[in-house]
């Protein structure tokens, strides 16, 4: 219980003193993280059971869950995935389900089947995990018809 309260207060403090991501026109920014530690957190938290990261060989032996599809993170995108969006997707995965989200990963009440890691995920893991994931998105300019 206290760990949850401390984590919530730490996140609230960081949110209130955070600044806008210089690469984005909206959102907030936590301190810089470490992508390698983020990859380690991805493996430690067993995110690979439901997710793959575009262009990353995670070298895991097997998944504990046999979902038909993995949710792919990273890769080419036509819009910027802001720091704030990635943080929100981790701490509140049901906030906004992406178009094309696998139906087998949506609960009967319309929420994400993603486990709640708020009681186990540390702030440092969150910062590093977001840094790791954000580094694997590539912005692709939208196609303009007739050009």
Where are these regions (language model features)?
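Bacterial N-terminal signal peptides that target proteins for export
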Residues: 1-6
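Processing junctions and N-termini across compartments
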Residues: 13, 41-44, 108
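C-terminal motif of bacterial Sec signal peptides marking the signal peptidase cleavage site
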Residues: 15-18
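Electrostatic cytochrome c docking/interface patches
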Residues: 20-43, 75-79, 147
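Gly/Gly-Pro-rich "capping" loops immediately C-terminal to redox-active cysteine motifs
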Residues: 35, 39, 52-95, 101-103, ...
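Short pre-active-site segment immediately N-terminal to redox-active cysteine/selenocysteine motifs
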Residues: 43-49, 54, 125
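Generic structural signal for secondary-structure transition and capping sites
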Residues: 47, 94-98, 138
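C-terminal capping alpha-helices of c-type cytochrome domains
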Residues: 88, 109-147
């Amino acid at each position: 219980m206290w760990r949850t309260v401390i984590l919530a207060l730490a996140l609230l403090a960081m949110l209130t003193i955070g600044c806008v991501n210089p690469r984005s026109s909206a959102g907030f920014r936590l301190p810089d993280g470490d992508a390698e530690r983020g990859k380690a957190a991805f493996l430690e938290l067993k995110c690979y059971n439901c997710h793959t990261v575009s262009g990353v060989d995670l070298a895991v032996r097997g998944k504990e869950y046999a979902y038909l599809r993995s949710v792919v993170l990273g890769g080419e995108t036509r819009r910027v995935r802001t720091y704030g969006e990635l943080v929100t997707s981790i701490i509140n995965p049901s906030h906004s389900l992406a178009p094309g989200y696998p139906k087998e990963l949506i609960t009967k009440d319309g929420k994400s089947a993603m486990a709640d890691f708020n009681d186990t995920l540390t702030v440092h893991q969150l910062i590093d995990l977001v840094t790791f994931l954000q580094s694997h998105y590539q912005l692709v300019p939208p196609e303009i018809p007739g050009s």
